[in-house]
From Swiss-Prot:
It comes from Geobacillus thermodenitrificans (strain NG80-2). Its EC number is 3.6.1.15, 3.6.1.6. InterPro entries: DUF402, FomD-like_sf, Ntdp-like, SA1684. The keyword DNA-binding does not apply. Belongs to the Ntdp family. This is Nucleoside triphosphate/diphosphate phosphatase. Disulfide bonds: none annotated. Gene3D superfamilies: FomD-like.
């Protein structure tokens, strides 16, 4: 069994908190590229279930990027006025045939079409760090990965490169036909 989902497979994405509780589930994402290092997925109008049972449906197509070594994942939301990115500071992903899974560590970076960005949820991170006793090593890793992610944004690296989204959104659209 490979440690990653195969291309074309429709998978769920499960986000957990550090204490092991479920945080959020995305019902359907099509795998556009799956390797042991990273998974690229696409979804549109997918059902999302929150930990408290509330559900909602995503509003626009999105290309998702998960890495097996970096402590973040990146969701590019394709809107009429441009591509918006939502970056979650998280554990690297794991794949177990049930779903692609990761631990959400509260800190987020929102990136706008002009590539300006905002670090979000620092208060929530500090509160959960205390409540769930995040180890100091995790705190250091996450803070280092915030800087790495900002570097990627500034350098237009990986998912932040315009050709990345153009390519993978095209692949996703081909699966939608």
């Amino acid at each position: 069994m490979p440690a990653y989902p195969r291309e074309g497979k429709i998978i769920q994405i499960h986000s957990y908190k550090h204490n092991g509780t479920i945080h959020r589930i995305w019902q359907e994402t099509v795998v556009l590229k799956g390797t042991s290092a990273y998974v690229i997925g696409g979804n549109d109008k997918t059902l999302v279930m929150e930990a408290d049972g509330r559900t909602w449906v995503t509003r626009e197509p999105a290309i998702c990027f998960f890495h097996a070594k970096h402590w973040f994942n990146i969701i590019a939301m394709i809107r009429e006025d441009g591509v918006y990115y939502y970056c979650n500071l998280s554990s690297p992903f794991v794949w177990d045939d049930e779903a692609l899974k990761y631990i959400d560590y509260d800190l987020d970076i929102k990136v706008f079409p002009d590539m300006t960005y905002m670090l979000l949820d620092e208060d929530e991170y500090e509160r959960h760090r205390r409540e769930m006793n995040y180890p100091d090593v995790i705190d250091r890793i996450l803070k280092n990965n915030v800087q790495k992610l900002i570097g990627w944004i500034q350098e237009r690296k990986g998912p932040f490169a315009p050709e990345f989204i153009d390519k993978w959104y095209g692949v996703f659209q081909a699966y939608q036909k």
